[in-house]
C-alpha cells in the first residue's frame, strides 16, 4: 500500500494475503451408467475435500447433501451433469460429469422359409438384434416358455413374435408373418366333349386344370400311357377310371379322378 501526504511525502508498506484454506476438490465416480436407452437409472457418487467444512453438494437432479461425502445420487439420466460443491464460506467448485447410455435395442424377425404346402407347419424364421448390450437372449412366441434361439423352424402359418432381452435386461420385440400357399387343387374336364364312348376306339381326351399351391405344375396320368402333360390324349372308354396326380413347384401333391 502507498500513502502520500500533502507535502508529497510517500510511505510504502506491504501486506501479505495468506490463503489458509486449500482449494475445494471433488472426486466423482459413476458407479453405474444408464442400463437401457432412455432409462434414468444411473448412479454416481461424490466426495470432497478442501475449503472450509461443512460442504454442501447441489446435484442437478435437485438432490442436496451436507458433509464431505461420499454422497450417492440415483436415477440419473443420460447426458451431461454438474454438481456444485459449496463450502462453509460460500466458496464453490463445479464438478462436471457425463452419463452414457447404450444404443436403443432393436429386434428384427424375418421369414426364411414360408410354409411349403397348404396346412403344413414347416415355416422357418430368423431373428437378429442391434443396440443394447450383448449378449442377447431370443425367445419365440411366449416370452416365458417359448422356444429359444435366433432360428426357429416347424412354424405354422400366421404371425409369430420374437422377444429379445439384452445383458442389462432391456427388451424389444418384433413380429414376422409366416405365409403359406393356397390349397393345391386339380379338376379333370372332358375336353371338348371328345371323350370316346365307342368301344374299341382311343379318341378320348381329358384335361387337368391345377390351381393354388406354387406354380409350375407337373402332371402324371394313370391312363396306361403315363402321360405327363396337362391333357391326356388317345384315351379309351374301356379304361373307365382315370386319375391325374399334380405336383407343384414345392412338391405339394393333389389328385383328381374321372370315371
Report residues per predicted region:
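Short coil/turn motif common to extracellular beta-sandwich-like domains
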Residues: 35-45, 114-126, 195-207
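Proline-enriched interdomain boundary motifs that mark the N-terminal boundary
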Residues: 22-30, 104-111, 183-191
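Short beta-strand segments within Ig-like beta-sandwich modules, predominantly Fibronectin type-III
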Residues: 62-69, 142-148, 222-228
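Short glycine/proline-centered coil/turn motifs in the loop regions
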Residues: 49-53, 130-134, 211-215
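Solvent-exposed segments in extracellular or luminal domains encompassing
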Residues: 70-80, 150-160, 230-242
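Edge beta-strands of extracellular beta-sandwich domains
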Residues: 10-17, 92-100, 171-179, 253-259
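Coil residues (strongly favoring Ser/Thr
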Residues: 6, 14, 30, 42-44, ...
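Conserved structural position at the C-terminal beta-strand
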Residues: 3-5, 85-87, 164-166, 246-248
Amino acid at each position: 500500500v502507498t500513502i502520500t501526504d500533502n507535502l508529497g511525502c510517500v510511505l510504502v508498506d506491504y501486506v501479505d494475503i495468506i490463503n489458509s484454506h486449500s482449494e475445494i476438490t471433488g472426486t466423482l465416480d459413476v458407479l453405474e451408467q444408464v442400463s437401457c436407452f432412455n432409462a434414468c437409472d444411473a448412479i454416481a457418487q461424490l466426495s470432497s475435500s478442501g475449503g472450509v467444512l461443512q460442504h454442501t453438494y447441489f446435484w442437478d437432479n435437485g438432490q442436496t447433501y451436507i458433509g464431505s461425502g461420499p454422497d450417492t445420487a440415483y436415477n440419473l439420466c443420460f447426458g451431461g451433469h454438474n454438481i456444485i460443491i459449496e463450502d462453509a464460506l460460500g466458496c464453490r467448485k463445479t464438478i462436471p460429469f457425463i452419463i452414457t447410455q447404450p444404443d436403443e435395442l432393436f429386434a428384427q424377425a424375418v421369414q426364411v422359409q414360408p410354409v411349403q404346402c397348404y396346412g403344413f407347419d414347416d415355416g422357418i424364421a430368423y431373428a437378429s438384434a442391434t443396440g443394447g448390450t450383448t449378449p442377447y437372449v431370443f425367445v419365440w412366441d411366449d416370452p416365458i416358455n417359448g422356444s429359444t434361439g435366433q432360428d426357429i423352424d416347424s412354424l405354422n402359418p400366421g404371425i409369430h413374435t420374437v422377444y429379445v432381452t439384452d445383458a442389462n435386461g432391456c427388451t424389444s420385440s418384433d413380429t414376422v408373418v409366416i405365409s403359406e400357399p393356397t390349397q393345391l387343387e386339380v379338376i379333370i374336364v372332358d375336353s371338348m366333349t371328345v371323350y370316346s364312348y365307342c368301344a374299341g376306339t382311343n379318341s378320348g381326351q381329358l384335361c387337368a386344370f391345377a390351381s393354388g399351391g406354387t406354380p409350375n405344375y407337373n402332371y402324371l396320368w394313370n391312363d396306361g400311357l403315363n402321360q405327363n402333360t396337362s391333357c391326356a390324349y388317345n384315351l379309351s372308354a374301356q379304361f373307365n377310371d382315370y386319375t391325374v396326380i399334380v405336383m407343384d413347384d414345392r412338391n405339394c401333391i393333389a389328385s383328381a379322378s374321372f370315371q
